[in-house]
């Protein structure tokens, strides 16, 4: 069995999860495990009340967690270790320091990159970097903005968010959709299909302690808490750069993976502020985790030959996944009903053991079912090149980074979100609210991804309740022809302002696998009336 570590929509699993089969065996619960967990979660616990509230399925799962990992609960860490800066730059080191009396305790520090040729990344494009500071909580979020190559005074703006939770959006910049990738010699390689071809793109490292972001505190461990920070970042950003929005330019949020959690919540937070200084025009969610209760039905079909690729698992493994599914879904339902850490944590651990670990143990790439995991950093050795590039002193100096060491993903953040119960929560309900407010939404999915696969994404969009759900469900899937390549590049289903797109030959990171078609998708969406 090949040993490696991978993100599962961000979750770091190890090969110790090979014990998953024993989760089928009922065990007695030592009540101390709940008391210990409560202490670690920082929760007051009325044990007798809790035992009455939790159903037997959830209690059995806690018992099995204790049985499989007897030392884990006692040693459990549920907060991020502080990430301290190498050196705080003084006010005079920044071109702009932006505050707003209506947003207490927040400020934005901004620098224009004086000579982009030093970095070799889109040298003819204006670039800004900086930090959002949450002063009373000692949180500092890093961002990097690239103006449109076309007409920044008129083109729309896109905020890009990578998932994880805990992965830097600079991964999106250098690995997927930004102006350059990084070669093995640590030299930038220009990307003709960058999303800033026709839009200004902001890459934001969030939540705190991700990428070049940092905090002297433990940061956040759930999606809702992160939403306020992102909204305030945008308010201050557009205070400083009103030229990006004051002529009626559109603003969009796009992201992938765990951003299927982030984006619905962040968009809801934005729309709740009627006096905001920018207009949220649409959102785009790529290979996201949004409705686990629906999506977890589709790991076995995707792994076992029903997603368009041959099965990667033997029949007995497929049968074991089928056998464990009913219990997995029952645990997710309990999480949906209570949205309590006590129900949601065991749902995540049990279901990821039962539905995801069998595939991972094969050594295949969870982000692309056609490939083996190449080892190294998250199955793609190129990600290590990105880390090495960003850790060079001249790069950190040029972008104003205050953190000594950059890492593409912070697995502590991932763990914190899991143990806050965030993973299995029903964020698709926020999508319902957004659609009912007439916000255009594009859900796209590369069809070679396993971990947030197209089968599950199509399924949840098909059953999502909203004001035109019957009309959407009745629409036929049709071919989508990409404008740049003029080839049939996917299948699309759309009604009014809701669109689902299956992207052929794309993995988890669609812009990495099919860059021309990804840019076609974005251009057609943001410049073509929010339909494909």
Curated annotation (Swiss-Prot):
What the record says about disrupting the gene is:
Leads to vacuolar defects as well as defects in the terminal steps of autophagy, when ATG42 is also deleted. The PCR1/ATG42 double deletion also abrogates the production of phytochelatin and the degradation of glutathione-S-conjugates.
Residue positions binding substrate: 452, 509
Residues of the signal peptide: 1-20
Family (UniProt): Belongs to the peptidase S10 family.
Origin species: Saccharomyces cerevisiae (strain ATCC 204508 / S288c) (Baker's yeast)
The UniProt note on how this protein's activity is regulated states:
Inhibited by ZPCK.
Function, in words: Vacuolar serine-type carboxypeptidase involved in degradation of small peptides. Digests preferentially peptides containing an aliphatic or hydrophobic residue in P1' position, as well as methionine, leucine or phenylalanine in P1 position of ester substrate. Also plays a role in breakdown of the autophagic body and the autophagosome-dependent protein synthesis. Plays a key role in phytochelatin (PC) synthesis from glutathione (GSH) by cleaving the Gly from GSH and form the PC-peptides of the structure (gamma-Glu-Cys)2-Gly.
Active site per database record: 257, 449, 508
Q: Sorted alphabetically, which keywords does the UniProt record give?
A: Carboxypeptidase, Disulfide bond, Glycoprotein, Hydrolase, Protease, Signal, Vacuole, Zymogen
Temperature remarks: Optimum temperature is 30 degrees Celsius.
Which positions form S-S bridges? 167-409, 304-318, 328-351, 335-344, 373-379
Chief subcellular location equals other
Report what the protein is called: Carboxypeptidase Y
Query: Motif location (Vacuolar targeting signal)?
Result: 24-27
The major lineage groups are: Eukaryota, Fungi, Dikarya, Ascomycota, Saccharomycotina
**SUPFAM superfamilies hit by this protein:** alpha/beta-Hydrolases
Which cellular compartments is it found in?
Vacuole lumen
Q: What class of enzyme is it?
A: hydrolase
According to the record, mutating residue 508 to A/R results in: Inactivates enzyme
